[in-house]
Amino acid sequence: MRRFKRKHLTVVDCHHLARSHLAVTQPFSQRWTNRDPNHGLYPRPRTKGRNRGRGCQRYISEFFLAGHQHCTNDMAKSNSVGQDSCQDAEGDMILTAESSCTLPQVDNGEARLGSSGSAQPARKRAHCFEEATESGQWDGVTKKTPRHRLFPSCSRLREARQGAEDSLSQCSPVPGEAGRDIEDIGPDPLPDSYYGLLGMLPCQEVPSHICRLPSEVLRHIFAFLPVEDLYWNLSLVCHLWREIINDPLFIPWKKLYHRYLINEEQAVSKVDGILSSHGIEKDSDLCVLNLIRYTATTKCSPSVDPERVLWSLRDHPLLLEAEACMRQQLPDLYAAAGGINVWALVAAMVLLSSCVNDIQHLLFCLRRPSSTVTMPDVTETLYCIAVLLYAMREKGINISNRIHYNIFYCLYLQENSCTQATKVTEEPSVWPGKKTSIQLTHEQQLILNHKMEPLQVVKIMAFAGTGKTSTLVKYAEKWSQSRFLYVTFNKSIAKQAELVFPSNVICKTFHSMAYSHVGRKYQLKKKLNLFKLTPFMVNSVLAEGKGGFIRAKLVCKTLENFFASADEELTIDHVPIWCKNSHGQRVMVEQSEKLNGVLEASRLWDNMRKLGECKEEAYQMTHDGYLKLWQLSKPLLASFDAIFVDEAQDCTPAIMNIVLSQPCGKIFVGDPHQQIYTFRGAVNALFTVPHTHVFYLTQSFRFGVEIAYVGATILDVCKRVRKKTLVGGNHQSGIRGDIKGQVALLSRTNANVFDEAVRVTEGESPARIHLIGGIKSFGLDRIIDIWTLLQPEEERRKRDLIIKDRFIRRWVHKEGFSGFKRYVTAAEDKELEAKIAVVEKYNIRIPELVERIERCHIDDLDFAEYILGTVHKAKGLEFDTVHVLDDFVKVPCARHNLAQLPHFRVESFSEDEWNLLYVAVTRAKKRLIMTKSLENILTLAGEYFLQAELTSNVLKTGVVHCCVGQCNNTIPVDTILTMKKLPITYSNRKENKGGYLCHSCAEQRIGPLAFLTASPEQVRAMERTVEDIVLPRQEALLFLVF
């Protein structure tokens, strides 16, 4: 065996050098000379043609720059919540917080400088040294010949390594080693407990990379990872890692935050104790100031220098405001013996922040080399503030959810950033053929790592725009040896899925599979009804004396309920409990009517199932009918390893029965908050179906923070969804009225869509428009037919007006327009009701308006100036700018005025209404134009779009009055800060110009946060203004009735 040729130092030598003024551990902090005193201690590069072994590094710095390990196909099975493979877990150790929280540019450039002052990162400086010189032997054997002119930092590193080699050669216990052929020297081993300074035997096993790091370094790395990863993956690696993660002193606030979210009893008790013992209570005006005082008690490293922290924060836009607040309200923390309390200052800046960018800028400043705080300490402080803010809202304290959301958003991006994430090419449903490249999030990677087994039921709870389709595509690609069935409800989505899924996936709709097995038989017999079963059809076949459109509607609804159910027999339980009488009133169905309804529905179903020809439309088989027959036949899909059910929130019990009865694995994917088809009998499979595994997708690729905040707040305030929070990306988005890119006008009803189409096509230069779903599906022909039916018979003959629609034409010889309208009301046909409303509103202008809309409509939406449609048709699509029109559910006024409307309750509206609004909001990518009602919803969470400014700056131009119309207060000179309402433009084109609020009006809106701007005594001394609420006439009548 050849001799291992390395310079060796004894332990005594190492300690001697460490205690010397040369400081071996920090050679670059010494004064540079032509000969570095540590010359010889640096690893030596290879100089001849012999290749290094695979995985070996040349310099010690390469050990810490290990490349990211890509995931292989051999992934471990996940637990009930999923887990990463070992390779992926190790790859995630390499974190760059700058990718998520660092601002793109800073004027002074300090953030990009290393501790040595070089503008180049350390790894780039080492790489520059290797490339800029040719290899040669050291110690006088051969000198290095420069290829180019070296950068100063590269030159210094070269000199440092040469000097270190000479110094080490003097201490070598083996004389003459320096003169031997350097080719015989093997590659540097990986660091051991002495980091290679004592050498390494040839037979010694090379240790793994990260496992040999000291516990202190591991703790620092682990602090940047999500809690889920720490407990589900890293704690299973080895005993050392498990001990670190379970150490109560390791990230205590981060752990406490997540334990509080899941209502762990000890965590809730601990946080409640902190709130009560430190005066952070609902009845205390100073609860926010007490929160800052408690945060100031956070333990930090003794090396924290307040002056250097202040210097690193010098260009933060909230520094002056936070300092002024502490100087006036917390003088003991501002003028502490050791300097200003750093964590109190950080807490004040966080509480005064108005957007995520303020928190990101704070993290950016504290990450500078001039700052002496560590990022784990900063992160722990933010988690401390976050858990206290969350608990304050739970206790009913009037505090904005925006502050907690800002903190959570920044920490989420910091912990879930990945420098080398897997890229996916995804084809959006809006623009077929146009592919965009995205990066798989950590949540998506967890799903990919899970191997499906027979009978498993997996749920993927995905928020809007989180990449459901791309996740399923990558899953199918990863598990390419398995066969999958992708099923959805929409035919166009299934066709687009065929273009993006790999060959091991079959893409179908539920109805297409049922048609191939059952429906085709009825088509061959010409007994297939291509349209929906209507009360008009049913009324024609009801028994004599038992007819009428109200009874026919009851029979239709009974059949619809049976088709949607998983039941095998039609029973009285399928008859609706409520119906509308002839006066349009909602009444309970009597028992006798129920019995009659189930008998007629059973007779109708028996005739529909017969394959013989029939003339009556009511006896023809419908699409939902043959789907029910297929479900009753108990189909077996045995050729697939797993079934992907997309948009699972819209599944009917019949469809769930088909899927759950299969022996293969099942993956239900969808957003439970996009369920908007309950009127069709859909139930939310994501809530009702028991599961073996559940995963979440919470980060949207579609929009940035502002739009994400609006969507998250709708779920928070209106549906009490707080355990999982919707977040977006790090790109810009806006919600205060500006427009960017293509504009979509989204409405709840078709009548409002028609109104907007009329508005945007008016004038000398009408806009190019596109109706979602196409102009034919919008039904302009039926609007013309209804208008024709409205005309007198003489007028129809005179102008040769013809009604094309067969159903509407029947009413010409029956009861005319009035009878048609009564039928639509009794049948509760929402589509025809909207068209009748349009005809009655525009009357004689209908032919002209329809012709104009048809002329301005273009089929290619890429070239349209405006895209119009209902939320139901826009579901699954996305647009640059979204105008939310004013026909959605309404909150009549802001939170501070709701006391004047004691009967208003958010809970009084159905979940479908809030889901419609959520779907509309989350279609936006760059800009969202809100209604006044939508802003009022945000005020329910405490968001009033206020921004703190120094009172001294506000009063530079003289006396400033409060911007609230009925308030007579002025801004006092002796206050510290003043809140400014930011301007906003609503979707009806009205503008709120904003302005400065007096401290009394500010306190009504933001509660105890106002006492950061002025003392409670100053606020109470001001006149309190009660605003008059002016509601639209229709809304006022509704509140009087209910």
From Swiss-Prot:
Task: List its EC numbers.
Answer: 5.6.2.4
Give one GO term, molecular function aspect: double-stranded DNA binding
Q: Which UniProt keywords apply?
A: ATP-binding, Chromosome, DNA damage, DNA repair, DNA-binding, Helicase, Hydrolase, Isomerase, Nucleotide-binding, Nucleus, Ubl conjugation, Ubl conjugation pathway
From the record, which residues define motif APIM motif?
Answer: 806-810
**Domain F-box, chain residue ranges per copy:** 207-256
Q: Which cysteines are joined by disulfide bonds?
A: none
Q: How is it modified post-translationally? A: Ubiquitinated. Ubiquitination by the DCX(DTL) complex, also named CRL4(CDT2), leading to its degradation: ubiquitination takes place after its localization to DNA damage sites, possibly to facilitate the translesion synthesis (TLS) pathway.
Query: Where does the UvrD-like helicase ATP-binding domain lie?
Result: 441-704
Q: Mind telling me which Pfam families this protein's record contains?
A: F-box-like, UvrD-helicase, UvrD_C
Q: In which pathway does it act?
A: Protein modification; protein ubiquitination
GO annotations of cellular component type:
chromatin; nucleus; SCF ubiquitin ligase complex
Annotated family: Belongs to the helicase family. UvrD subfamily.
Q: What is known of its domains?
A: The PIP-box mediates the interaction with PCNA.
Q: What is this protein called?
A: F-box DNA helicase 1
